[in-house]
């Protein structure tokens, strides 16, 4: 499903085909040529996957055939890279392996642990496993220390990655495993029981929130703007979260998990949590660029 809708605008929950996309309720409707996205939704949909269950993503390129229909930036040829995934070369989204509007490309992401052909090949380690859908774990080969957690996939077009990602061709992907199954209620000695929920066997997101942080810029008409001639690194002057300007999220008085993605072109972040009094709130870092950290 979509990331948490904090704007209260129903249009954010449907397709962008004829839907009025606003980055803030008081901002103008964005032109369709200014924003490109996955699967016709905005923000792009979240992909949830578990280990040992391969993902086949058929990516249709439905962008305009007219190369100038881009609001001044971005290229309509695409190649999709699943960042930090252990994927075969033909499905890695190499920068020159692009396809044109009207075409599609099939990406096969096998969802395997690193070292699956050399480490724990007999699949005896319970820490190397995947949810079985019935509250248990199915053991799999590979190195549990390389368990992935939070990924993203994005356009990887040669010379145009920054522009296409800036326009919206980027989405998050959650990996689920025996260590990180997305069910905080299962206590089997392996599951880390990170904040999530309990209704589903795996992949609960009641208290597990994906957040894409990105700086943007608008032109004088309030439309998304980018400077393609800035080769030193474009930096926007407005911060967004999940493509919303000044969003909010209603929460309960309990622990939450936030999966943060730096979706900016050049900017880096120092992230902190503050209470209403401006005092810092402590938090735990559980993963970094995909991998669950040593614990």
Enumerate the language-model features and the residues they cover.
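Short, glycine/acidic-rich beta->alpha junctions
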Residues: 39-41, 132-136, 143-150, 157, ...
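Residues that flank catalytic or metal-binding motifs in active/ligand-binding sites
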Residues: 43, 53, 76-78, 101-105, ...
